[in-house]
Design a protein with these regions (language model features):
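Short beta-strands and strand-loop turn motifs
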Residues: 37-39, 66-71, 124-129, 177, ...
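Conserved nucleotide-sugar phosphate-binding/catalytic loop shared by glycosyltransferases and other
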Residues: 34-78
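Nucleotide donor/acceptor-binding cores
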Residues: 3-5, 208
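Active-site and donor-binding regions of nucleotide-sugar-utilizing enzymes
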Residues: 6, 10-11, 18-28, 68-170
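A nucleotide-sugar donor-handling region in carbohydrate enzymes
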Residues: 11, 43-46, 149-218
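Short N-terminal binding/cap micro-motifs at the start of the first secondary-structure element
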Residues: 16-19, 45-47
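Short, surface-exposed amphipathic charged segments that create phosphate/polyanion-binding patches used
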Residues: 52-53, 79-84, 187-193
Length: 218
């Protein structure tokens, strides 16, 4: 009998790792749980900073590195990468036999991990189900992961209600908030001078500032 439950998280890029960092830390600090991570996708690319090194520097065990990025901008390239990733995650999960698989949102590693867990009868915990991103494939992937998952950690009440409307049992759905806010709350605010230095142009206290963020269509 294992002393601790093994939670295997799968992360594919710095952005999802940052969002989940407080969750990983809480698991790591729990006396009855063990966290290991699979690094895949952009984490293993020099073009994106080879951020698997950041995961290790944070003190986490990287259970495996699953290469999945292929050069090319066409849709078939992304699907081929997904297929490669699926094979790699199968091998890792078969070797480790984790108690729970942990995924975030709507990316390739979310759907591949959820498929592996479903076919191998391993519970899947999904963070960020029920959210909406109209106009791209993310919505379909996220809802598909929801239907494959067993435990749902929604980031807001509306998303939790959407998960319930998809037919999930209420005792499996938890409205826990967005874990990405934990990192923001722990980050000291910058004054105008420091922000100006970071951005490379002058910002003055009290003057209006507009920030525009564009989410690419995937």
């Amino acid at each position: 009998m294992k002393d601790k439950r093994l939670i295997l998280g799968v992360t594919g890029i710095r952005s999802d790792y940052d969002l989940m960092s407080s969750v990983y830390r809480a698991i790591d600090d729990h006396q009855d749980l063990e966290i290991q991570l699979v690094a895949t996708g952009a984490h293993l690319s020099d073009s994106y900073g080879f951020t698997v090194d950041e995961i290790r520097s944070d003190g986490y065990v990287v259970a495996d590195e699953v290469e999945s990025l292929l050069n090319g901008d066409l849709a078939p390239t992304r699907v081929k990468g997904l297929a490669i990733q699926l094979q790699g995650i199968v091998q890792t999960v078969a070797r480790l036999s984790p108690d729970i698989l942990l995924v975030l949102g709507d990316r390739e590693e979310s759907i591949t991990t959820a498929l592996v867990g479903s076919y191998m009868n391993i519970p899947i915990a999904h963070v960020g189900g029920g959210d909406r991103a109209v106009g791209n494939v993310d919505d379909q992937v996220r809802h598909a992961v929801t239907k494959l998952a067993h435990i749902h950690f929604a980031t807001n009440r509306e998303s939790a209600e959407r998960i319930l409307r998809l037919g999930e049992q209420s005792f499996r759905v938890f409205d826990v908030g967005n874990p990405g806010l934990d990192r923001l709350l722990q980050t000291p605010p910058m004054d105008a001078d420091e922000l100006s230095s970071r951005l490379g142009f002058t910002i003055k206290d009290g003057e209006p500032l507009i920030m525009l963020i564009q989410h690419v269509i995937s």
